């Protein structure tokens, strides 16, 4: 069964999306490369430079970038975690996710039909003391730069609240809340979040381990919100995909996550039905990214 469905995934997903299309000449070269070599196989998201927010022509320039990117073939806007966390203005002040100077950009994305894939903050554990009660203590030991000192950076909850504020203020814009908004450990909260913001989708990149340790609750979540979830992954490493397939598609029990620095628990399969897997793997993406060539995918 696993082998059949893994093949099923690859044949139904002939598209890869590059979230780092950048902008300007770099985006132009990326789009040119795609059009000349594999015009139907890649989607490119544009990126903006928030740290130019104080420039007199910041808004005009970025609205132009979005319009031209859309015309040239880009399919969305990707917002990296630096916004709200490390990006600063010309005076060194942190730029909040919901900085009102950015409001016209979110609105423009809605008008253009440009989904906004937004990654805000980090796992909440990165703000917590590095002790035996922190599930990601080993990761923070091995990668100390991931620790977020509450005395030096805004709290996890404050950054997340800023993100949710732009969802609220822009109901006409489709947002994809990356990494399940770091709420995969609390699916009741995640469900309430999706109920509150009907313009928000989410994706499962980097949170598989949280889903795999609560298979019954996670399966119920996928059943309830099957039209709101996308398949996502931070990096393209083929060997890691099989753990995703195993969690999503099988009823296997008590197996390891693919990394050793965190997720020190066993994983369990959700055994999702084909009807949900198809939505997760491609149907939901086709709905919110209509420029993707739907003829590459089965109709059923």
Model-flagged regions — what are they?
Residues 1-40, 60, 284:
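An N-terminally biased module of ancient metal coordination in phosphate/nucleic-acid-related enzymes
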Residues 8-11, 42-47, 77-79, 116-118, ...:
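Hydrophobic faces of well-ordered beta-strands that scaffold small-molecule active sites
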Residues 4, 38, 72, 111-112, ...:
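Helix C-cap/helix->beta junction micro-motif
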Residues 17-18, 51-53, 84-86, 122-127, ...:
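Active-site environment of divalent metal-dependent phosphoester hydrolases
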Residues 23-24, 55-59, 95-99, 155-159, ...:
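A conditional alpha-helix N-cap/helix-loop micro-motif detector
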Residues 151, 157-300:
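H/E-rich (His + Asp/Glu) clusters that bind or coordinate divalent metals
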Residues 2-9, 71, 110, 282-286, ...:
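Sec-exported extracytoplasmic/periplasmic mature domains
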Residues 26-147:
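Active-site gating/metal-coordination segments in enzymes
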């Amino acid at each position: 069964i696993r082998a059949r469905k893994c093949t099923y995934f690859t044949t139904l997903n002939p598209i890869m999306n590059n979230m780092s299309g950048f902008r300007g000449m770099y985006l132009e070269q990326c789009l040119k490369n795609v059009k000349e070599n594999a015009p139907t196989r890649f989607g490119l998201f544009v990126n903006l430079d928030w740290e130019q927010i104080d420039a007199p022509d910041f808004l005009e320039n970025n609205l132009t970038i979005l319009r031209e990117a859309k015309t040239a073939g880009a399919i969305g806007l990707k917002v990296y975690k630096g916004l709200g966390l490390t990006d600063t203005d010309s005076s060194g002040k942190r730029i909040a996710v919901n900085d009102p100077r950015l409001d016209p950009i979110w609105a423009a994305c809605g008008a253009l039909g440009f989904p906004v894939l937004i990654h805000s903050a980090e796992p909440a554990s990165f703000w917590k003391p590095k002790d035996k009660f922190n599930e990601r203590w080993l990761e923070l030991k091995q990668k100390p730069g991931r620790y977020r000192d509450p005395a030096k950076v805004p709290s996890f909850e404050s950054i997340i609240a800023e993100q949710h504020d732009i969802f609220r203020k822009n109901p006409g814009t489709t947002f994809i809340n990356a990494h399940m908004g770091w709420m995969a450990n609390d699916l009741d909260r995640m469900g309430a979040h999706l109920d509150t913001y009907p313009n928000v989708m989410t994706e499962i990149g980097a949170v598989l381990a949280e889903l795999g340790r609560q298979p019954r609750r996670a399966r119920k979540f996928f059943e309830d919100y099957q039209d709101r979830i996308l398949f996502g992954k931070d990096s393209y490493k083929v060997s890691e995909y099989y753990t995703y397939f195993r969690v999503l598609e099988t009823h296997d029990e008590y197996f390891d996550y693919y990394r050793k620095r965190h997720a020190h628990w066993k994983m369990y399969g959700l055994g999702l039905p084909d009807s949900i897997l198809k939505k997760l793997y491609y149907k939901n993406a086709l709905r919110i990214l209509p420029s993707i060539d739907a003829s590459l995918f089965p109709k059923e």
